[in-house]
Design a protein with these regions (language model features):
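Short hydrophobic alpha-helices and adjacent helix-cap/hinge residues
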Residues: 1-140
Length: 140
C-alpha cells in the first residue's frame, strides 16, 4: 500500500474466503469505481476467474492476475514466473544433489532471472485496451 501511494495509486482491498464471496466482492469493488483489479495467486480466485471477469467486463474494469492461467481465464495481463522454466531450474538443482555435487542444505535459494509477460489479447480488445508496441516484443 505504501509503495502504491508513492505512485498516486489508492489500494482498495477486498477479501474472499470461498467462491461464493467473489460476486459480492467484485460488485463492491465496481461500486467503489476502482480502475483496475489485481488478483494474487489463489486457488479460490483461480477457480472463479470467469465469474469475476463477467462482472468486471461489464463495468470495463481490467483484471491483472498473478499468473498465466488466471490471465487466460479472466485477466488481461500478467508478469509472472514461467512454470516450465521454474521446473527446469529446479531439475538442475536436483541433478546436482543426485550427482553428489551438492547437499540440499547447502544449495542457495534461487529465483528466476526472467519473468514472463502474458497478455489475453481478446480480453484486452474487449475492454478497449491497446497493448503498446514496446510490450509486444516481450509477450509470450
Amino acid at each position: 500500500k505504501a509503495y502504491a501511494a508513492t505512485k498516486g495509486i489508492t489500494v482498495v482491498e477486498a477479501t474472499v474466503s470461498n467462491v461464493n464471496d467473489i460476486q459480492q466482492a467484485a460488485t463492491n469493488l465496481v461500486n467503489q469505481d476502482v480502475q483496475a483489479i489485481y488478483t494474487p495467486t489463489d486457488n479460490v480466485l483461480a477457480s472463479a476467474m470467469a465469474n469475476l471477469a463477467q462482472i468486471t467486463d461489464a463495468a470495463k474494469i481490467p483484471v491483472f492476475a498473478a499468473d498465466e492461467g488466471m490471465t487466460m481465464t479472466g485477466g488481461v495481463a500478467t508478469y509472472s514466473v514461467d512454470y516450465y522454466q521454474l521446473g527446469y531450474q529446479t531439475g538442475l538443482m536436483a541433478a546436482k544433489v543426485l550427482a553428489g555435487e551438492a547437499k540440499i542444505a547447502d544449495l542457495a535459494i534461487e529465483t528466476q532471472k526472467e519473468i514472463k509477460l502474458t497478455v489475453n489479447e481478446e480480453r484486452a480488445k474487449k475492454l478497449g485496451i491497446t497493448i503498446p508496441e514496446a510490450l509486444r516484443k516481450d509477450m509470450k
